[in-house]
Amino acid sequence: ELKKLREDKHYYGNFGKQFLSNSDISTLLTNPLPLGQSMKPIPAFLVGGYFHTAILEPHKLKNFKIIDATSRNTKAYKEITNGELCLLQHEVDKTEMLVDTMMTNEVCRDLIRGKNVEYEVPGIAEIHGQLWKGKADIINHDEKLIIDLKTTADISKFKYSATKYNYNSQAYIYQELFGYEMIFMA
């Protein structure tokens, strides 16, 4: 099962839906009826995905469709994308600057690129009678840390995002799954 969850198509697809994940917490807290249904993609998550990929799996960046348009409302964007959500070139440029900033920070770089580090590691565990899954961005075995990469439009508002997206429950679930303390890098 874990090997299958390494592939995004299984982790996010039907196979992965048999497990609860931190993404389900908001649904469970606010309106459990749509539990298990796919979420509509939004630009912020697409940008976050690009950021993760640029740091953890740069060989997969070619899978992102990038449009040189000023906004998603332009005629050119709509004609090229055919309704598909795509990255805008200026979003990619800004994200590449964020990647450079993170990777030139010595502490961040050493935690991300340490000697005994794994990327995109899936985990499954029974927690309080339910099967949960998670995929750790980075497991640094030397530091005994799970590292989760986050993007934010405004770092001063990150604490509100942490509440909104239930990072506290994510930290708990991942500590149960992987046995290390979790930190967030934004």
Give residue spans per PLM region.
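Metal-dependent nuclease catalytic cores that hydrolyze phosphodiester bonds in DNA/RNA
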Residues: 1-133
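Mg2+/Mn2+-dependent nuclease catalytic core
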Residues: 116, 121-186
